[in-house]
């Protein structure tokens, strides 16, 4: 599997061979589905909550006598059919998160990388190590790579780089991805995946031995 390699300025240098251990794994749609579903579930706060009739304040007194009024019998003003009453079968706080095995996560990551490579959506760039905040420079890099206005760009770099992270944060279509904390959502939900050389080497160590 081949990919285009670019300089720090975004100029095309050559075409390189991508590591087969990372980009030629068998596609596992089921693994991608389970990994994405788990990540989506883990993002949910689960803070939704309604009050049942036992939680609503008031309503302890019977509103009127059982007999003799001519009206329907009522036991509480907080019954569900009353205005201001409790909710029946409403949502309660809950934890939606769940875990998937590390083996499944590895398989999902490799499947996504392989799918991206087949679609020619993987680009390799020389290591980016800015010494100052400069959004304009990175906007120019993506423009030179002909990626501007092509959709979301996933920029996969090694570790945390504050200058780099905050510089690209001002570009709406660029998603900063730390190679030490890769999520399937980050590498899947983009049009192009730009990987630095250092990040590629680190991924090879982390995911290359897994199948």
Swiss-Prot record:
Gene Ontology cellular-component terms listed: ribonucleoprotein complex; ribosome
Entry keyword set: Ribonucleoprotein, Ribosomal protein, RNA-binding, rRNA-binding
Ranges of compositional bias, category Polar residues: 46-55
Annotated GO MF terms: rRNA binding; structural constituent of ribosome
Assembly mode: Part of the 50S ribosomal subunit.
Family to which the UniProt record says this protein belongs: Belongs to the universal ribosomal protein uL4 family.
Name of protein: Large ribosomal subunit protein uL4
Organism: Leptospira interrogans serogroup Icterohaemorrhagiae serovar Lai (strain 56601)
Gene this protein is translated from: rplD
């Amino acid at each position: 599997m081949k990919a285009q390699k670019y300089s720090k300025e975004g100029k095309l240098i050559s075409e390189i061979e991508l590591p087969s251990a990372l980009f030629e794994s068998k596609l596992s749609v089921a693994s991608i589905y389970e990994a994405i579903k788990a990540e989506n579930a883990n993002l949910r706060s689960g803070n939704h909550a309604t009050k049942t009739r036992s939680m609503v304040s008031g309503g302890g007194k019977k509103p009127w006598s059982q007999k003799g009024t001519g009206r329907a019998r009522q036991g509480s003003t907080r019954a569900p059919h009353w205005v201001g009453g409790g909710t029946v079968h409403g949502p309660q706080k809950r934890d939606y998160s769940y875990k998937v095995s590390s083996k499944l996560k590895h398989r999902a990551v490799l499947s996504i990388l392989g799918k991206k490579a087949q679609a020619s959506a993987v680009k390799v760039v020389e290591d980016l190590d800015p010494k100052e905040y400069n959004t304009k420079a990175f906007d120019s890099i993506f423009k030179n790579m002909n990626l501007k206005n092509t959709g979301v760009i996933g920029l996969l770099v090694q570790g945390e780089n504050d200058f780099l992270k905050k510089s690209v944060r001002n570009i709406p279509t660029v998603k900063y991805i730390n190679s030490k904390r890769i999520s399937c959502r980050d590498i899947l939900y983009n049009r192009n995946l730009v990987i630095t050389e250092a990040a590629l080497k680190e991924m090879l160590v982390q995911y290359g031995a897994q199948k």
